Amino acid sequence: MAAVSLTVSTVKPLGDRIFIKVSASEEKTAGGILLPDSAKEKPQVGEVAQVGPGKLNDDGSRQTPEVSIGDKVLYSKYAGTDIKLGGDEYVLLSEKDILAVVG
């Protein structure tokens, strides 16, 4: 079996799945206190890196995703599957877990 090299461009989400690059979490508080990894909040904002073809409807047609590559989005805190690629954090989630497009 050949080894597969995973990069953002080789990840092709299926159905209504969206692949998001997670924004970096805050390293310190507003008062200047450095936060250890265990105290950092899980980020809920990221940039859309890849978009699936859309949800398949009962009649066989596809529902076009409402987000596009490059959109900044706010998503549910515990949604999706966390993935690490090339030192960056990503999350693969269903479009229904995206709450809003921001910025």
Curated annotation (Swiss-Prot):
Leader sequence residues: none
One GO MF term: protein-folding chaperone binding
SUPFAM superfamilies to which the protein is assigned, alphabetical: GroES-like
Compartment list: Cytoplasm
HAMAP family reported in the protein's UniProt record: CH10
NCBIfam families xref list: PRK00364.1-6 (NF001530), PRK00364.2-2 (NF001531), PRK00364.2-4 (NF001533), PRK00364.2-5 (NF001534)
Family: Belongs to the GroES chaperonin family.
Protein name, UniProt field: Co-chaperonin GroES
Species assigned in the record: Prochlorococcus marinus (strain MIT 9312)
The organism's taxonomic lineage, starting at the top: Bacteria, Bacillati, Cyanobacteriota, Cyanophyceae, Synechococcales
Gene designation per UniProt: groES
